[in-house]
């Protein structure tokens, strides 16, 4: 199994060990906003930590850790253009597999420009990109994201739109990867995620979105077992917990 979206820098070493013991082979840890992120230097140090420390912590725990670097819509400096210029330097690292997490949260024009610039980088560098959608105003945010994707003309195979739920899955009218987040306190229960996978034919990728808030380190094995128990097609199960993430991140 591959946990395709986490924030390991705010999780314990013991969590990594438990995930390895539960059958997780690879974990993707994404850039986010653990602080105010009020200056570019804070982001640069954050990216550096993910690449140089979180990968090593994974090795120590017996699980492969790969990294996504990007600028999160919930926290970024006013002069974020500096980070867009610096980001390509990090994309060459062998452990960086994607740009992200980026996306829309408050739906400001500045956020849209920030997302647009990261999408252009992903297009230019042929790099996968992880796009966040918010808990509130998710439909509105998704519609705006789809408009920006049309504008940038990035390949569908490079895009994962994340945190999708049963109210928004029908809005995705293209062959992008669709992220389902099993995080019962804020996003999907494992039962809800399983029902979406059972009833739709899309390129689903499951993740736990482990971070500083309440989450489930066993989200993937729990959902995998439940899908098996309710008769979800085995190919769909394997695709959602492993194969699609492997293809998206080119692991």
Curated annotation (Swiss-Prot):
Alphabetically sorted, this entry's keywords are: Hydrolase, Metal-binding
Task: Return the InterPro entries for the record.
Answer: DNase_TatD-rel_CS, Metal_Hydrolase, TatD-like, UCP005295
Give the residues the record marks as binding a divalent metal cation 1. 5, 7, 101, 209
Q: Which cysteines are joined by disulfide bonds?
A: none
Q: How is the cofactor bound?
A: Binds 2 divalent metal cations per subunit.
Q: Which PROSITE patterns does the UniProt record give? A: TATD_1 (PS01137)
Q: Which GO terms describe its molecular function?
A: hydrolase activity, acting on ester bonds; metal ion binding
**So where does a divalent metal cation 2 get bound?**
101, 132, 163
Could you say which EC number(s) this protein's record lists?
3.1.-.-
What the entry lists under Pfam families is as follows:
TatD_DNase
Required co-factors: a divalent metal cation
Q: Which family does it belong to?
A: Belongs to the metallo-dependent hydrolases superfamily. TatD-type hydrolase family.
UniProt-recorded name of the protein: Uncharacterized metal-dependent hydrolase MJ0761
- The scientific name of the source species is Methanocaldococcus jannaschii (strain ATCC 43067 / DSM 2661 / JAL-1 / JCM 10045 / NBRC 100440)
